[in-house]
Swiss-Prot record:
Coiled coil feature spans: none
Identification of the protein by name: Glutamate-1-semialdehyde 2,1-aminomutase
Domain of life the protein comes from: Archaea
Gene Ontology molecular function: any one: pyridoxal phosphate binding
The UniProt record lists the keyword Isomerase: yes
Entries under Gene3D superfamilies matching the protein: Aspartate Aminotransferase, domain 1, Type I PLP-dependent aspartate aminotransferase-like (Major domain)
Residue numbers of N6-(pyridoxal phosphate)lysine PTMs: 266
Catalytic activity field: (S)-4-amino-5-oxopentanoate = 5-aminolevulinate
EC number: 5.4.3.8
PROSITE patterns hit by this protein: AA_TRANSFER_CLASS_3
Subcellular localization(s) per the UniProt record: Cytoplasm
Gene transcribed to yield this protein: hemL
């Protein structure tokens, strides 16, 4: 078992220290208590209880190279030897910015921050500052962090104004965010017909990664781009997950769509805290100190993060990361399909390159409402069975399975067999 006596004792201590015993809610979803990690290397996590686990979570997306990749480790050690915080610019942020912009916004500009939440918050403020408008449009099931403007769900069917999904978010703030279904062109057109001249920005995950994995319909993306441009709203592509995972050009290159503002995180930090906002010079020049849209941060463009991110992107350019990751996810998809096809049980597997999720009890998942109808109890049992077999998938089917460079050879064999045998066990229970 991944969680043993040492993990249990640590959890008893942390329950007295942290709300719910953890510092991010999803970590508490591993039952009966989280396993505590001693170290990570390659495809594996090693727990304080002596278990070795194949990691198909990869820190919820950032570690596409796996744990402790040699080039990232070397870059971080070299950066640490030079000092780890200056309060002044360094060369690494210049090199990383040039590399990122070359792929996601040629000729544009970028601002580094410290998390995806900070990045989406800054992007929304920037869209409002640029357009002079007040409303933001988001989509049901898309996750954009933990600030007030995006902790919002759809209200009554008669209105598009959002309602808070968290205590502490004022209703007046939530009403500045419109919410409509993902992948629904007709609903999108209705929102723009009614509110188009007030919408500052449309923020969207090109592939939903926090209601399971839900790929976009191409006509939906095309409508997003067309309606945003026609109305004068800025299209904000939240590529915190998809950026540098679907390819070097992210979802923009993969789906042939262009955002006005691109939000990045996760992979570009190489496993260290990071976020970024990229856009045209016209839009980005509004950020302080050049313009009047405020953003600042002691840890923005942190030297260690910049070094890790630069090493990661170089590895993505030079190593077979995308092909290996894709084939690993494909192998998992095929193993699950092989077992489930024999049962007659309705299911669907959504996979986009190296991110995927399995939904039991539904034959299609193209929006969050359909994802929520999937059999959650089945998935939790699957998660638990796989953990018993030394394979870690997210504890909720509203998260994603991620594969990366180290998921090959023995690690992939363990993962595939763990999935296959776990499915058979759950189906037989």
């Amino acid at each position: 078992m991944a969680s043993g006596e040492k993990s249990r004792m640590l959890f008893e201590r942390t329950k007295e220290l942290f709300p719910g015993g953890v510092n991010s809610p999803v970590r508490a979803a591993v039952k009966p208590y989280p396993f505590y990690v001693k170290r990570g290397e390659g495809a594996y996590l090693y727990t304080v209880d002596g278990a070795r686990i194949v990691d198909l979570v990869l820190a919820y997306g950032p570690l596409i190279l796996g744990h402790k990749h040699p080039r990232v480790l070397e870059a971080v050690e070299e950066a640490l030897a030079r000092g780890w915080l200056y309060g002044a610019p360094g060369e690494a942020e210049v090199l990383l910015a040039e590399k990122i912009l070359g792929y996601v916004k040629r000729g544009g500009m970028i601002r580094f921050v410290n998390s995806g939440t900070e990045a989406t918050m800054t992007a929304i403020r920037l869209a409002r500052g640029y357009t002079g408008r007040d409303l933001i449009l988001k989509f049901d099931g898309c996750y954009h962090g933990s600030h007030d403007a995006v902790l919002v769900a759809a209200g009554s069917a008669a209105a598009h104004y959002g309602v808070p999904t968290s205590a502490g978010v004022p209703e007046a703030v939530a009403r500045l965010t419109l919410v409509t279904p993902y992948n629904d062109v007709e609903a999108l057109e209705r929102v723009f017909a009614e509110y188009g001249d007030r919408i500052a920005g449309v923020i969207v995950e090109p592939v939903i990664a926090n209601a399971g994995v839900i790929p976009p319909r191409r006509e939906f993306l095309a409508a997003l781009q067309r309606l945003s441009r026609e109305s004068g709203a800025l299209l904000i592509l939240d590529e915190v997950v998809t950026g540098f995972r679907l390819g070097l050009e992210g979802a923009q290159g993969y789906f042939n769509i262009e955002g006005d503002i691109i939000v990045l995180g996760k992979i570009i930090g190489g496993g260290f805290p990071v976020g970024a906002v990229a856009g045209s010079r016209e839009v980005m020049s509004l950020l302080t100190p050049q313009g009047k849209v405020f953003n600042a941060g002691t840890f923005n463009a942190h030297p260690i993060t910049m070094a890790a991110g630069l090493a990661t992107l170089k590895a993505l350019e030079e190593e077979p990361v995308y092909s290996v990751s894709r084939e690993a996810a494909k192998a998992l998809e095929e193993a699950a399909s092989e077992v489930l096809d024999r049962t007659g049980l309705p299911y669907t597997i959504n996979r986009v390159e190296s991110m995927m999720q399995l939904f039991i009890g539904v034959e299609e998942v193209s929006n969050a409402a359909q994802a929520r109808k999937a059999d959650k109890k089945f998935y939790v049992k699957l998660h638990e069975e796989m953990l018993r077999r030394g394979v870690f998938i997210a504890p909720s089917n509203l998260e994603a399975v991620f594969t990366g460079l180290p998921h090959q050879g023995e690690a992939l064999e363990i993962a595939v067999e763990g999935l296959r045998s776990s499915l058979k066990t759950v189906l037989g229970s």
